[in-house]
From Swiss-Prot:
<keyword id="KW-0963">Cytoplasm</keyword>
<feature type="binding site">
    <location>
        <position position="415"/>
    </location>
    <ligand>
        <name>ATP</name>
    </ligand>
</feature>
<feature type="binding site">
    <location>
        <begin position="30"/>
        <end position="33"/>
    </location>
    <ligand>
        <name>ATP</name>
    </ligand>
</feature>
<dbReference type="InterPro" id="IPR027410">
    <property type="entry name" value="TCP-1-like_intermed_sf"/>
</dbReference>
<dbReference type="Pfam" id="PF00118">
    <property type="entry name" value="Cpn60_TCP1"/>
</dbReference>
<dbReference type="InterPro" id="IPR001844">
    <property type="entry name" value="Cpn60/GroEL"/>
</dbReference>
<keyword id="KW-0547">Nucleotide-binding</keyword>
<keyword id="KW-0067">ATP-binding</keyword>
<dbReference type="GO" id="GO:0051082">
    <property type="term" value="F:unfolded protein binding"/>
</dbReference>
<protein>
    <recommendedName>
        <fullName>Chaperonin GroEL</fullName>
        <ecNumber>5.6.1.7</ecNumber>
    </recommendedName>
</protein>
<dbReference type="GO" id="GO:0016853">
    <property type="term" value="F:isomerase activity"/>
</dbReference>
<dbReference type="InterPro" id="IPR027409">
    <property type="entry name" value="GroEL-like_apical_dom_sf"/>
</dbReference>
<feature type="binding site">
    <location>
        <begin position="87"/>
        <end position="91"/>
    </location>
    <ligand>
        <name>ATP</name>
    </ligand>
</feature>
<keyword id="KW-0143">Chaperone</keyword>
<dbReference type="GO" id="GO:0005737">
    <property type="term" value="C:cytoplasm"/>
</dbReference>
<comment type="subunit">
    <text>Forms a cylinder of 14 subunits composed of two heptameric rings stacked back-to-back. Interacts with the co-chaperonin GroES.</text>
</comment>
<dbReference type="GO" id="GO:0140662">
    <property type="term" value="F:ATP-dependent protein folding chaperone"/>
</dbReference>
């Protein structure tokens, strides 16, 4: 086992504090509308330019092991805030830095660290309650657009696109962010259910100009098996031909003789057919087939429940207003499934989301809900260069997380104002002893730090602006973009309650642990390898230097 280096008391805390400040100082330059960028060097390719706090934090590793421990703990604050609300990482870092700095001053002055922590925790619990009271629901498109704009660093186009996307696919819909091909940001909305499986044969194409298959009011046959024998399909094909409607077959696979016969029938115009593979694999495929069945009002033909393909009739098939199939995707528009059945299925999947343990499963289940309930919107980010594209994409993703958080828990006045107001409400809060009261004061003073940092980044004097904001009331605050005072809600400067709450809770949690640190242990740096010349026996080798 490697030898350890151990530091106690003030020695340990000073080193840790230095690490905290290095990381926090790098992150906090990005806060607010006039925050600057940070350039991150990459081992290959162009450097990354970002204004995203957590991206900066993740890049920082310090040489000194003790300082690095401090930096890593603050990194944890940013990561946790990012995981919980998807935004507010810089605010969380600024709060943590302030609590740690003020808290360690109090420890150095002889206060009891455990009581300080209890005081900080008490103040944060009270602050979260007050934040919830200040919170107003965020339901209309205008408020959603404002939240998106603020989170995307005052980029109004992004805010409006996110609001439009939420309007189109609903609050529960899936909105994904992709790299676009042009200079402009675009929004693509896919209504209906779309899955990533295209036609099994190009001979099914009936719209050569778009290279797609379009079926109007088709019957939809869903089979949880491979179909290779045409005899299994004949009864279905005859019934559909009599009904005079097209047919879409969604099965595990359609191959060999069965596929060839379908192609021949289509080309001769006997019956309009298209076949696609079922989406997903294994159990997920079964579940997605069932989703399509619920959406279209059909039944999945599965041998597991004793159903045979030969005996399937028109009553077992789903129907939709229209189906569009391209090389890679199939979109089912306006399925004829019953509303009650669809909402029941959505509720069932939501329950599975709550029980899911992995993020991947949760994401896939969320996609299924969206496909059943709303639709899917794709935000395509436009930029002139790849470096700008990466930076902008990260900002758009942040803005999207922020708007989701706003819809979930509402919004409060932005620009650091909500925390200043909350701190003012808690001036009468008291702990069980004087040390706890100091802890409460530490937390309340830290709540001003985001506002101070926003003002500082805008090149103004933090104390002057903070006092002016404190003298006001309600949503009165300072707009760093235009350098004027007024109602933050009217300015359209809103922060999601969830983002502000998460930032405060995680900052206080980690900062409290750092204040109560008394000892730090790390591996000793490995010394240089011992010089072979010092071994005695090989000393005579020194004379070989002349042979070079």
């Amino acid at each position: 086992m490697a030898a350890k280096d151990v530091k106690f008391g003030n020695d340990a805390r000073v080193k840790m504090l230095r690490g905290v400040n290095v990381l926090a100082d790098a992150v906090k330059v990005t806060l607010g509308p006039k925050g600057r960028n940070v350039v991150l060097d990459k081992s290959f390719g162009a450097p990354t330019i970002t204004k995203d706090g957590v991206s900066v934090a993740r890049e920082i590793e310090l040489e000194d092991k003790f300082e690095n421990m401090g930096a890593q703990m603050v990194k944890e604050v940013a990561s946790k805030a990012n995981d919980a609300a998807g935004d507010g990482t810089t605010t969380a870092t600024v709060l943590a830095q302030s609590i740690v700095n003020e808290g360690l001053k109090a420890v150095a002055a002889g206060m009891n660290p455990m009581d300080l922590k209890r005081g900080i925790d008490k103040a944060v619990i009270a602050a979260v309650e007050e934040l919830k009271k200040l919170s107003v629901p965020c339901s209309d498109s205008k408020a959603i657009a404002q939240v998106g704009t603020i989170s995307a660093n005052s980029d109004e186009t992004v805010g409006e696109l996110i609001a439009l996307a939420m309007e189109k696919v609903g609050k529960e819909g899936v909105i994904t962010v992709e790299e676009g091909t042009g200079l402009q940001d675009e929004l693509d909305v896919v209504e209906g259910m779309q899955f990533d499986r295209g036609y099994l044969s190009p001979y099914f194409i009936n719209k050569p100009e778009t290279g797609a298959v379009e079926l109007e009011s088709p019957f939809i046959l869903l089979a949880d098996k491979k179909i290779s024998n045409i005899r299994e399909l004949l009864p279905v094909l005859e019934a559909v031909a009599k009904a005079g409607k097209p047919l879409l077959i969604v099965a595990e696979d359609v191959e060999g003789e069965a596929l060839a016969t379908l192609v021949v029938n289509t080309m001769r115009g006997i019956v309009k057919v298209a076949a696609v593979k079922a989406p997903g694999f294994g159990d997920r495929r079964k579940a997605m087939l069932q989703d399509i069945a619920v959406l279209t009002g059909g039944t999945v033909i599965s041998e597991e429940i004793g159903m045979e393909l030969e005996k399937a009739g028109l009553e077992d098939m789903g129907q939709a207003k229209r189906v569009v199939i391209s090389k890679d995707t199939t979109t089912i528009i306006d399925g004829t499934g019953e509303e009650v059945a669809i909402s029941g299925r959505v509720t069932q999947i939501r329950q599975q989301i709550e029980d899911a343990t992995s993020d991947y499963d949760r994401e896939k289940l969320q996609e299924r809900v969206a496909k059943l309930a709303g639709g899917v919107a794709v935000l395509k980010v436009g930029a002139a260069t790849e470096v700008e594209m990466k930076e902008k994409k990260a900002r758009v993703e942040d803005a999207l997380h922020a708007t989701r958080a706003a819809v979930e828990e509402g919004v409060v006045a932005g620009g650091g104002v909500a925390l200043v107001r909350v701190a003012a409400m808690l001036t009468e809060l008291r702990g069980q002893n004087e040390d706890q009261n100091v802890g409460i004061k530490v937390a309340l003073r830290a709540m001003e730090s985001p506002l101070r940092q926003i003002v500082s980044n805008a090149g103004e004097e933090p104390s002057v602006v903070t006092n002016a904001v404190k003298a006001g009331e309600g949503n009165y605050g300072y707009n760093a973009q235009t350098e004027e005072y007024g109602n933050m809600i009217d300015f359209g400067i809103l922060d999601p309650t969830k983002v502000t709450r998460s930032a405060l809770q995680y900052a206080a949690s980690v900062a409290g642990l750092m204040i109560t640190t008394e000892c730090m242990v790390t591996d000793l740096p490995k010394g240089d390898a011992p010089d072979l010349g010092a071994g005695g026996g090989m000393g005579g080798m020194g004379g070989m230097g002349g042979m070079m």
